[in-house]
Each structure stands twice: as structure tokens, then as C-alpha cells.
Amino acid sequence: MSFYKEKSINETNLGSFVDESNELFFSALSESSMNHGTPDDSILLDLVSRSDNKDLYQDSLDVRDNFSNLSSDEIPQSSSYEQTRKPFFHHFNPFEFLEATSPLQQNGKSRDTEKPPSMKEKDLSSNSSSQHDKAFHERVDQGKNKSSTTKYQEFRTVADYREFSPGQSVNSLKPNSGDEVPSTKSSTSSEMHTQLLKDEQKKILTPAPDVPHDVYCIEPSLGRVFSFPASFVASPLLLEDCNKIASCDLPYSTFYANSQVIDKFSEYFAYVDQDPCHIRVLNANTDQSLILYTQSDVKNLHFGKNKHTKPHLLVMDALSNLYVWKILQKRSEISVSLLFTIRRANYGICDWIPNSSNMFSMIVKNSLYIVDISNIRSNNISPKVYAKDFNGLQAAKVDLPGPINSYTISSDRSVVAILVNSQIFFYSFPVSNLFSTNPSHRGNWAAIATMSLQLPSTANSISFLSSPPNNNDIIDKVICVSYANNTILGLFDFGLCAFTQEIEFSNEKEKSPIQQLLTFNNSNMIVAKRNQLLDIFIYSPSDLSNVGVLSNTAALISAVSKGKRFGDSGYINKVISNEVVDHSIVFVTLIGCDSSKLELILALSSGYFQFCIESDSKFDEGTSLEYPNSDKRILARASLTSGLKSNNTLRALSQDLKNCAKSKDDSTTQNLTESLGSVCYPSMPFFNQYVPQNPNEVRENISSVMKSRIHAKFESLHSRVELVVKNSYMKLLEQTISEAATDEISDLFKLIHSKPFLLEVGFLETGFLANDLENLTSTYRSSNRQLCDFSNRIGNINQKLEKLLMIERLETSDQSPTSSSNFEESESFAVSKKVLELVRISKNKEALICFTKDPSIEAFRSLQDVPDYSLDDCSSIHLLAFIHVLSKLIIKEEQLSFSRLQLLSRATSRLRTMTLSVFNNSGTLTPELFSSVVRIVLKNVREFVLIGNSSIQKSKHEFLITTLQALLREVDIFLNT
């Protein structure tokens, strides 16, 4: 099918041209293979915040929105079993204290809604490293004496094995608590399981006695982002807990990228033997086996999953040879029959159609082929001839506009989704009558919908995710999209027509891309393999109980593309993670999945193992590896349109842009350059992180950032502009940039469209949407006045804060230093002396105000004798100013550092009790200003350099961060209600 021909859907009947498709299929097999690689074109900006070098404390307030700093906890990574790990809080849970003392919880005028039942905290206890090491080695020693037929491992959460070193912090939102549980050698899996069930009834989860851990429960909602913290340690998966299938030496060098070297169907196993050119087929019931031979190293092998036919094995080798064997069981002997071989087939991806053993799909160049082998008979086929000489081999295909990156077929076999660059094309899949002998009854390939992905980087792969509804009709409600070099997985829920979840497989400490992404028919489980980790996610999609007439996935996608919406938000229901200890994972395959258990086959460097995970009642509520940050939003966006999308507008506009530099009409150039300026930063992290102070700062920052990075942006602009035009981040741009940036952007793009620049970046051939660009230009101009007013309002925040800080200052002494060289030292000494005198006569409040006015190390040293409860007499404005100046002091003495933490904690707790009354009774201290100062204080506290190795000091520092975060959440709730 020609992608650009103007044909109606009814005329697009590729199944009716089987003969023509066969000829194209066989001719394409002998040509060169296609290239699937696409570079990552991530265009995220990082703006380094400025800081002045002061001897005592930092510069005056910079009112900035540091969302990224708030969500990135610096947690050092440590070994799994070598360091001593103890929880920070043994007998005191600061989170419970914060909840109990919150005015929003106690005040009858609380603006917050009642927490749902699923927002229950489960504080779990931890053990020391010595107990863990002892129990771990005892388990290994016991495992060596186990039989190789051990089939099941207890189903545990990822958090069951999460560990922290003394230098690490537990989650600041919900620190773990509880008494330590002693480790006993006699503890068995069944005893632990029984104890867990008993503790669940008491609402107390007791961990496995040999490992420390913590678990946080979350309330499922739209837009959650799950990430793996740097300190995350997965559950150790011991081979003694698996059923060994075969022992083999399988080094990584033997196999290729995305290899599948083992599969199972019914009672048959097929796996690559010690020789990479040998495939061993094993009957698990009779222990009989035989060896199949290939011309070169095996790259992939798959069993057909049709339970009503004989097993068929599809094999591909490194020389692009394709084999199909039929497995036969004759009484007590196992035998095979080679159906056919395709020599040197330059295919990309090849696999069976779901629940089929007579049709498989494969990619050749820019086309997806469906091959039918149901009419082939092995007794009259010579395995040495080419496939084009066979009688009975049928093929149908669909052509795409570019190289196919990935494709997936729905569980009900009604839809095939094909990923090309940043677009997903959905076609109806008439599998039942695609190769009907009657031409009038043959099914049609119909274009259902097109999804335009708007991602921070290029999409890598796609996969359908299904779950059976009440009527037992399988409908795939979710499509998984991996991007950012397979480090982020986004879940697009068709019920809401939006990305509802993102799972991040990387953090600041390590990058762990997804090396394999697996889903199983009729299941909502996602299995991701990364390095030596197996991560399992169970997604509960939106409820489609009200769809009624929708009978399959094709009907659902078609209805959603036309504007209909079904159900509520989906959410990640369960998270499990296992780490294979001392072994490398070559490949993982799913062989069975239902509501009670999950069966996997692991191809490890030492052999093949069958691993079964059984469900457990303690996973009824959702668990997360890291408590989601409410400020962290999903970046992935997508728009679903009905049918195929025309690209005629793109081609027409590309010529206009190419001739832009030759035009002498300034108005034409101005329109185009301003439009390009609107789409230059699709993700807009610059404007997310920095709020401009005034128009001059806007001009300065826009100029410096754009001039230094404009060339790098245009290197990726050729593949992104069409998507960015409709990106929702354009609204963010219109709300934050000021009118002062217009002239600067215009001058920059006039330079860009000069002839020398066009010669340098000749790839500007890519087109843009003319109408959308024109509309954006009009919107951009009309919003300038509002943006300028917003910038001026933000610019006044610093001035207002400075005025507030002077309300309660005391008059300074009349002492005047005679020498300018010792002015600062004399003033600091005078303030310190005055503070000390005020403390001596018990005027604690006046001493605190004096320090707030002129903060210094000497003045703070004089405050050490002031009891922290004296802060209760201070006003809210003074407390806010006090925690601000105290957080900026640079302290290098352990005793002073400890005193600062104690005073900051007391002042912050006092602020929490008076927050609502401050906002209701004060006309000057606004919630916006209050929130800005608290964010700056939180940023400064996170950057404290603790002096000494006192565990008490570390716990107080952690508690202070938790208190500030709780205060910030309460202010945000007040602002949002």
C-alpha cells in the first residue's frame, strides 16, 4: 500500500492482492536489511543557578522555583552486604509527629480532603548488616543442599530487601520505623509467610527476618512518575529457588542484541545448547530430547502458541536464515519435521502471531509481512531450496513511510501497531480471513488511527498491555512506549487517551536502560530486564465496564480516536524486583501469567532456570519504589487522530523555509522567525526552573542561553518541530517569557536564516505546519502585555521581602568604626557583644531579632545559651526571616552546626502551627512569598555540610528536611484550594 496515495479505507484492501504481495515479499527478502537505529535527540536544558562567594553567608534572596532540586535527593550508593545499616529512627517516627502536629489535621477549617484508605503508611523495621550477612550466607549454604527441582520462591516486595548505610537517608517523606527483628536460622519460607499474614491482619507488616526494608503505600492517581532511587537494592534471587532446566556456559559474547535463546510451549523446551549452532528440544515429561542444527549461531527462537495444533518452532540465525520445524511425539520418541527454510532473508523482527502456530510476522525494509504456512506440507518440500519456489506459502504486507522501529499485535489479534520514528500507526488486522481462498471474502487492512508521540527523545519500542474484563473478552487497554534510550517507560491508557504513568529506570547515580521489555497475552504484567535486575510491574488500567458495545481492541482505539473517553485513571498496582546474584542474565521469557502466579524462564550465564512467582495477599495495595513527588509531572504526550495523517502540508512548507533567507520581505522573515522562536524549546526546563526577576534579566538570560545552545537545538529540530507545534508546553512558554525577549529572539533567528547559517545546517529541509505556526505567532504577540505584567510582579518579590525583614529590627548601636579596614570585624564584634548582653539579661526574643538583623558566626555563637522555646514568642515574619538567614550561614564547627539544626527545627515547627492564621490575618505576607522563602530555605538545608559523624546530628538534619517539606506541602494545599 502506498502511504501517500489518496485512497479511501475501503479501497485499501491489501489482503486482496495476495499474489502481488507474494511477489514483493520474495523479492524483498534478497535485498539489503534495513537500519533500525535512531539517535537520541533529547533536547533538555539545564540552567546552573548562580551563587556569590561570601565568607559568611550567601547572597540575598533569589526567588526561584527549584522544583528539580526538591525532587533529587542526593543519596550515596553503597554495597549491598558490606556496610552496617541501621535505621535513623528506632523509637520515634517523625512522619507521625508531623501528621499529628499539622494544623491542617487539627484545625476544623482544614482545606485538605480526607486521605483515602490506600494512603496508609506501613513502617517496617530494619536489621543490622551483621544479621543480614549471617542470614544471607546461611540461606546460600542451605540452598546448596536443596534439590534442583525446587520450583517456587516466595513472592516478596522490592522493599523487602531495601537497605541504607549510615551515610544514607531513608525516604524523607515517610522514614521507616519500628523495632528490629532478630534473625533466626530456623526461620523458613512458610513460617515467614504465615507471620506476614498475621501481621497484615494487625496492620503491621513484619519483614523477612534476614533483611532490612521499608514499604510505602501510595494513592493511585493520574500522572504518577515512578523512579529508582540511587540507594535501591533489589531482592536477591538465588538459583536454589528456581527449577534448573539445563546447565550451559552462556557468555554474553555468544549472543546478539535482543536475542531469545529459550522458549517453552506445553511440555516442550527449546534452547540453545553448548554449541551456539545447536538447538536442543526437550520433552519435560519424558526427559527425551534431540538436537536441531542451524547454519550459523542462533539469534532467536519462538514456539507458536496455538494449543490446538502441534508445536511449531520458528528459528532465526545470524546469517538471516529462517527455519520452521514441526515437533512430533511418536509414542515414546520425540521427532521433528522441517517445514521450510528461507535462505538469507534480510528481515528485521520476526515472531509468531499471538495464539497462532501457522502465521508469523516479519519486517523486511519498510514493510510488515504476514506469512501463512498453513498450506505447506513437509513431505514434498526440500529444505535446501528457496522459499520463493514453494507452493502454498502466502504473504500479505503493509507499507510504511519509513524504517519500522518496532511493532506489536494486540492479544485479540484485531489491531497491529507499528512504530515509525515518532508516530504509531494502528491497522485493523483481519487474521481470520486474511488469506481466504475466496477473494470476495478476504479481509481488509484498514487504517484505524495515527498516534503522534510528543516525547523528550525518540521512541525506542512499543508493546500492547492487556487485561481480561468481566465478560472474558480480551481488550488491550494500554500501549507501552519506551524512550530515552530505553531508560523511561510510558504507559498510554486508551480509556483516557493519555499517558497515565511513567517508570524511570535511571537516576543520577547510574543509568540502567531496559534491555528487554516483556508483556504476556491476557495479562497486565510488565517484565523489564536491566543488567542483573528483573523488575515486574502490574498495571491496573482504566475501568471499561461502561463501554458496552466495544467488542475488541480495534473498536476501542477507533472510538477513542473519534473523541470518546472511557473509565478513570489507571495506576501501577504492584511493584516487584529481583536481582540475580553472581550471574549474568542473557535473556528472559514469559511462559505463563495469570492472577495467581507468574512463570519466567531465565537464560543465565550458567544455564537455564524456570522461575515461578506466586501471588501473596500482602500486595493488595499499591507499592512504589520511591514515594512520587507531586511536583514531578509526566513529560510524555500523545495525540490520537482517526485514520492516516497527511504530510502534504509538511512538504509544502519546507520549501518556504528554505527560501526564507532569500526573501527581502522583512515581514515574512519576522513571522517565520518569531514562530520558530516559539518552538525552539519544546520541553521548557529553563522556564520551569527559573522565574525571571525583571525584563532586563529576561533579556540577559534569553540571550546567553540561546546564543550558546541554538546550534545544538537545530541539530535535532529537523525531526521534532512538527510535534512540538502542538505540544502543551507552548502554554507554559506563553505564561513565563516576557515582552523584553521578543527583539532578542528576532535578532537571533535573523542571524540563523542568513545564507551562511543555512549552508551550515542544510538539514532544515524538514517541514513545519504552516497554519499552526501562523496561529502560534498571533497568540505569541497578543500575550506579550500579560507576560510583561507577570514578570514585573515577580520582580517585586525581592523588594517586598526586604521591607518585611525590617519590620521588627532593633536600632543599632551608635558605635562608629574609625577605620574602614576593620569595619566588618568591629561591627560583627559589636553585634555579638550586644546579643550576649541580651541573652544574659534573659531578653531572648530581642537577642534573636538582633541576630536576624546582622547575622554572623560570632553573633550566632552568642545565641547558644538561648533556649529554643524562646522562638515561640516570635512573630511569623521574624521566624521566616530567622530561618532564612540562619540557613545561609556557613558553619564549620560541630557544636554550632548542631545548635543550628535544633533552632531551625524549632522555628519551622512553630511556623507550621501558625501558617493558616498568618495568611488569614496578614495583608503583606502572602502565601506565594511564604512558599518562595521556604523553598529557598529547603534548598540551603539540603546543601548543609554536616561536621562530624554524629548519628544524632544526621537524624536531626533528616528530620528538619522532612519538616520543611511538610510545611511546603501545607502551603501548596492552601494555594490550590
Curated annotation (Swiss-Prot):
Keywords: Phosphoprotein. The modification Phosphoserine is found at residue 165. Residues 109-124, 131-144 have a biased composition (Basic and acidic residues). Residues 166-175, 183-193 have a biased composition (Polar residues). It holds the Pfam family Beta-prop_EDC4L. One of its GO terms (cellular component) is cytoplasmic stress granule. This is Uncharacterized protein C12G12.09. It comes from the Eukaryota. It comes from Schizosaccharomyces pombe (strain 972 / ATCC 24843) (Fission yeast). Residues 100-152, 166-194 are annotated as: Disordered.
